[in-house]
């Protein structure tokens, strides 16, 4: 019984170290989302901080289109960050299953 608890504690410590490393990697990550055939692109960090917005000069006179494309590009980038985060955090949990709805990072 003690061996099982010690092993579980070692696994938990290893998982915590892996999660910390994955969070640090995500903070450095940059993901690009685009919309309108790349007329608008948004670069987000792995923590969903907006780093840059690029707008093709050919659409600068169409405010409504710009607004729609920025929102779509942001959502595209956000979905990519979520997918990357899920993948990295999943491998950081050492295959341990987490309860449904349990989000990482904490």
Swiss-Prot record:
State its location(s): Cytoplasm, Nucleoid
Q: Name one GO cellular component term.
A: cytosol
Q: Name one GO molecular function term.
A: DNA binding
Predominant localisation class:
cytoplasm
Q: Which UniProt keywords apply?
A: Cytoplasm, DNA-binding
Known function: Binds to DNA and alters its conformation. May be involved in regulation of gene expression, nucleoid organization and DNA protection.
Family in the record = Belongs to the YbaB/EbfC family.
User: What's the subunit arrangement here?
Assistant: Homodimer.
- Which HAMAP family does this one have? DNA_YbaB_EbfC
Q: What is the protein name for this chain?
A: Nucleoid-associated protein PD_1058
Question: Which organism is this protein's natural source?
Answer: Xylella fastidiosa (strain Temecula1 / ATCC 700964)
Please spell out the taxonomic lineage of the organism that makes this protein. Answer: Bacteria, Pseudomonadati, Pseudomonadota, Gammaproteobacteria, Lysobacterales
């Amino acid at each position: 019984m003690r061996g099982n608890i010690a092993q579980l504690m070692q696994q938990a410590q290893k998982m915590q170290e892996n999660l910390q490393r994955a969070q640090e990697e995500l903070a450095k990550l940059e993901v690009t989302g685009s919309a309108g055939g790349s007329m608008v692109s948004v670069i987000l960090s792995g923590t969903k901080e907006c780093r840059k917005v690029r707008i093709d000069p050919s659409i600068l006179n169409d405010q409504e289109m710009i607004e729609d494309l920025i929102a779509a590009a942001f959502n595209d980038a956000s979905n990519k960050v979520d997918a990357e985060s899920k993948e990295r955090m999943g491998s950081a949990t050492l295959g341990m299953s987490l309860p449904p709805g349990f989000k990482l990072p904490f």
